[in-house]
């Protein structure tokens, strides 16, 4: 059996049928996420070296000074054991510092560094432009409606922390 290398010919894709999943919301949510992340990678990751996940974590740390690593893991819906790797990356980039809690030596508190604050401000501007470009085919009202509907869906998930706010 020959392994497929590269992209298939456009003629192969012209006849592609997705079957019943073409009517499933989850399928379209995933396709939308892939498209958004692909554009983020082209515009933000290539220039700033930050993935959507790292950007999200920087936002949460910046808006919650002293947040513990465990709380960050819950807020980002990431396994606590894998959060250490990501925090290490952010610390190695000089964007955050990890301090031992004065009340519990087993707990680490996360804070932005001055260079991290500057980098986040620059990245936020780029993300705002990227987000506007990505949603350019939607009116402001449609964009607001879509965000509202998506929030309603993920807030019904029993594993989404109730105290996570925008």
Swiss-Prot record:
Q: Could you provide one GO biological process annotation from this protein's UniProt record?
A: response to stress
A Pfam family found in this protein is MarR_2
Q: Which GO terms describe its molecular function?
A: DNA binding; DNA-binding transcription factor activity
Q: Which residues form the HTH marR-type domain?
A: 1-155
| Keywords tagged on the record | DNA-binding, Transcription, Transcription regulation
Q: Which InterPro entries match?
A: HTH_MarR-typ, MarR/SlyA-like, Tscrpt_reg_MarR-type_CS, WH-like_DNA-bd_sf, WH_DNA-bd_sf
Q: Which PANTHER family match?
A: HTH-TYPE TRANSCRIPTIONAL REPRESSOR YETL, TRANSCRIPTIONAL REGULATOR, MARR FAMILY
Q: Its function?
A: May be involved in the regulation of genes for 4-hydroxybenzoyl-CoA reductase.
The protein, known as: Putative transcriptional regulatory protein for hcr operon
Q: Organism, per UniProt? A: Thauera aromatica
């Amino acid at each position: 059996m020959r392994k497929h290398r590269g992209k298939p010919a456009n003629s192969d894709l012209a006849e592609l049928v997705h079957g019943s999943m073409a009517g499933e919301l989850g399928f379209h949510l995933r396709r939308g996420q892939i498209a958004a992340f692909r554009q983020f990678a082209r515009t933000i990751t290539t220039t700033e070296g930050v993935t959507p996940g790292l950007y999200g974590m920087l936002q949460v740390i910046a808006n919650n000074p002293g947040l513990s690593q465990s709380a960050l893991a819950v807020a980002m819906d990431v396994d606590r054991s894998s959060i250490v790797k990501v925090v290490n990356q952010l610390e190695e980039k000089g964007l955050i510092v990890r301090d031992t809690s004065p009340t519990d030596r087993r707990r680490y508190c996360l804070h932005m560094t001055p260079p991290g604050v500057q980098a986040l401000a620059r990245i936020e501007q780029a993300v705002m432009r990227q987000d506007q470009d990505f949603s350019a085919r939607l009116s402001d009202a449609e964009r607001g409606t879509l965000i509202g509907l998506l929030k309603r869906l993920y807030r019904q998930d029993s594993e989404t922390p109730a105290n996570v706010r925008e």
